[in-house]
């Protein structure tokens, strides 16, 4: 009996437990059914998630390794280049360089950047994509300074076409070296070159070429320089060899400049010519006016020195002679010779006066001597020389006593030279004429100096112009 009681009690408890759990299961199931979305709602929720999710990029930049060039291991990738010169900013003779602003464009094909497109339209990007893909490593050979413009943003444009063709453009200002020859300065023409080359890839990996030949280089018609006339722009290309790395394709932008001469005519040639002509004025000044002729000669010499110094200060120090140096130094020699010419005239005048003074002391008595004629070298007399009184013109007729002294001096000189005729008559005549007429050197200089300077100018401009 106790066993039967225990079994009945156990069954009763079990049934009570089952019955007590049935309502709770229904409430839980009902709550789940009311909060459970329908099948249609789940489908709409998935569509929303697809629409608002992150779109997959068309270029698939993350799927490729762009540290390697396109078609790595195959033939060299061709990279076309064209350039549009925006401005030629400056030419420096002292630093031997030039500054140019240009648009540099590269063209190549990278199949890794191909994307599907029904309209075959390209996609344009700014400079941020350049850091994620492969671009040609072109640099400027012999450049001193260069930079990419960044106002208001980096002036870089990347355009990708559906078939993988890429256009890469940037705006650059570069200062590059230009080897100049100043042997004809300022009547010279200079040819400068801007050279482009791949830094790392040899001609076996990258073939750099002008995309459209000479048409690949375009210039702005408004480009002008203050001191130069731009004559010609043209392109060339060749291979450059480095002993440690190999052969590289190199592109050249060549341009020829011809210097404007008018500025230097006003600043250099015209002042130098005026100084030479001013030095000739001393030939028309009386040789007895020592202060006037000396001061004029010194002034012209110093002015020429200033002109030469000013020209050299604005030019590089070269080890050869330039055309302007020839003109300035020849002009300086003409000015200096005009000073030496007066030194010779003054010296000969002093010697003549000393000789006359000695002869005056030798023949002190001139009483009753009223000759109106003087004796020449051959023993004859000349009335004109008597009036000239040993080289003085007729307009300067002296008092009677001094005139008689001059006549005696003149006769004494004639007698001395006549006695030495055997040593050379012609030499004595020329020496006597120069000593008696020291102003004759000025007369000859008035013709000789301008004539030689004109001949020099004709030769100079015919050779260098």
Swiss-Prot record:
Any one GO molecular function term: inhibitory extracellular ligand-gated monoatomic ion channel activity
InterPro entries tied to this protein: GABAA/Glycine_rcpt, GABAAa_rho2_rcpt, GABAAa_rho_rcpt, Neur_chan_lig-bd, Neur_chan_lig-bd_sf, Neur_channel, Neuro-gated_channel_TM_sf, Neuro_actylchol_rec
Glycosylation site list: 120, 254
Keyword Glycoprotein: yes
Catalysed reaction, written as an equation: chloride(in) = chloride(out)
Cellular component, GO annotation: chloride channel complex; GABA-A receptor complex; GABA-ergic synapse; intracellular vesicle; postsynaptic membrane
Subcellular location: Postsynaptic cell membrane; Cell membrane
Keywords attached to this entry: Cell membrane, Chloride, Chloride channel, Disulfide bond, Glycoprotein, Ion channel, Ion transport, Membrane, Postsynaptic cell membrane, Signal, Synapse, Transmembrane, Transmembrane helix, Transport
Entry superkingdom: Eukaryota
Regions of this protein lying in the Extracellular compartment: 21-260, 315-325, 465
Cytoplasmic-side positions: 282-293, 347-443
Binding-site list for 4-aminobutanoate: 105, 169, 197
Phenotypic consequence of residue 299 to T: Loss of picrotoxin resistance
TM annotation in the entry: 261-281, 294-314, 326-346, 444-464
GO biological process terms held by the UniProt record: chloride transmembrane transport; gamma-aminobutyric acid signaling pathway; visual perception
Record membrane topology: Multi-pass membrane protein
UniProt note on tissues of expression: Expressed in spinal cord and in cerebellum. Expressed in retina.
Cystine bridges: 178-192
Matches recorded under PROSITE patterns: NEUROTR_ION_CHANNEL (PS00236)
Activity control: In contrast with rho-1 and rho-3 homopentamers, rho-2 GABAARs are not inhibited by picrotoxin.
Keyword match Transmembrane helix: yes
Subunit structure: Three rho subunits (rho-1/GBRR1, rho-2/GBRR2 and rho-3/GBRR3) coassemble either to form functional homopentamers or heteropentamers. Rho-2 is unable to form a functional homopentamer. Interacts with SQSTM1.
Domain notes: GABAARs subunits share a common topological structure: a peptide sequence made up of a long extracellular N-terminal, four transmembrane domains, intracellular or cytoplasmic domain located between the third and the fourth transmembrane domains.
Family: Belongs to the ligand-gated ion channel (TC 1.A.9) family. Gamma-aminobutyric acid receptor (TC 1.A.9.5) subfamily. GABRR2 sub-subfamily.
Function per UniProt: Rho subunit of the pentameric ligand-gated chloride channels responsible for mediating the effects of gamma-aminobutyric acid (GABA), the major inhibitory neurotransmitter in the brain. Rho-containing GABA-gated chloride channels are a subclass of GABA(A) receptors (GABAARs) entirely composed of rho subunits, where GABA molecules bind at the rho intersubunit interfaces. When activated by GABA, rho-GABAARs selectively allow the flow of chloride anions across the cell membrane down their electrochemical gradient.
Name this polypeptide is given: Gamma-aminobutyric acid receptor subunit rho-2
Originating species: Rattus norvegicus
């Amino acid at each position: 009996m106790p066993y039967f009681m225990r079994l009945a009690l156990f069954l009763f408890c079990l049934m009570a437990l089952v019955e007590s759990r049935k309502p709770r299961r229904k409430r839980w199931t009902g709550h789940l059914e009311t909060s459970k979305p329908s099948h249609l709602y789940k489908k709409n929720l998935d569509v929303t998630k697809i629409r608002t999710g992150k779109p997959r990029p068309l270029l698939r930049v993350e799927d490729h390794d762009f540290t390697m060039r396109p078609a790595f291991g195959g033939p060299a990738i061709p990279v076309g280049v064209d350039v549009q010169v925006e401005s030629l900013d400056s030419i420096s003779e002292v630093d031997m360089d030039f500054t140019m602003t240009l648009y540099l464009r590269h063209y190549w094909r990278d199949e890794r950047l191909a994307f599907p497109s029904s309209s075959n339209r390209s996609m344009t990007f700014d400079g941020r994509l350049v850091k994620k893909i492969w671009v040609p490593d072109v640099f400027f050979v012999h450049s001193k300074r260069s930079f990419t413009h960044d106002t208001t943003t980096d002036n870089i444009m990347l355009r990708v076409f559906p078939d993988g063709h890429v256009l890469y453009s940037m705006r650059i200002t570069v200062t590059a070296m230009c080897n100049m020859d100043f042997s004809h300065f300022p009547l010279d023409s200079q040819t400068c070159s801007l050279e482009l080359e791949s830094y790392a890839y040899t001609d076996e990996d990258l073939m750099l070429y002008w995309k459209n030949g000479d048409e690949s280089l375009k210039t702005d018609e408004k480009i002008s320089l203050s001191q130069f006339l731009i004559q010609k722009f043209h392109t060339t290309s060749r291979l450059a060899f480095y002993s440690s790395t190999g052969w590289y394709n190199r592109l050249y932008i060549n341009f020829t400049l011809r210097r404007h001469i008018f500025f230097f005519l006003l600043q250099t040639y015209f002042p130098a010519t005026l100084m030479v002509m001013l030095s000739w004025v001393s030939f028309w000044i009386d040789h007895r006016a020592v202060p006037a002729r000396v001061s004029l000669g010194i002034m012209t010499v110093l002015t020429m020195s200033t002109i030469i110094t000013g020209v050299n200060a604005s030019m590089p120090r070269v080890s050869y002679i330039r055309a302007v140096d020839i003109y300035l130094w020849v002009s300086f020699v003409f000015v200096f010779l005009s000073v030496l010419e007066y030194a010779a005239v003054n010296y000969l005048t002093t010697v003549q006066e000393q000789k006359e003074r000695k002869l005056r002391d030798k023949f002190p008595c001139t009483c009753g001597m009223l000759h109106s004629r003087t004796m020449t070298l051959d023993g004859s007399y000349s009335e004109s020389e008597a009036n000239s009184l040993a080289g003085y013109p007729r307009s300067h007729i002296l008092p009677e006593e001094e005139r008689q002294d001059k006549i005696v001096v003149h006769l004494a000189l004639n007698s001395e030279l006549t006695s030495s005729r055997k040593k050379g008559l012609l030499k004595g005549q020329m020496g006597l004429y120069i000593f008696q007429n020291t102003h004759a050197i000025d007369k000859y200089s008035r013709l000789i100096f301008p004539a030689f300077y004109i001949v020099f100018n004709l030769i100079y401009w015919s050779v260098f112009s």
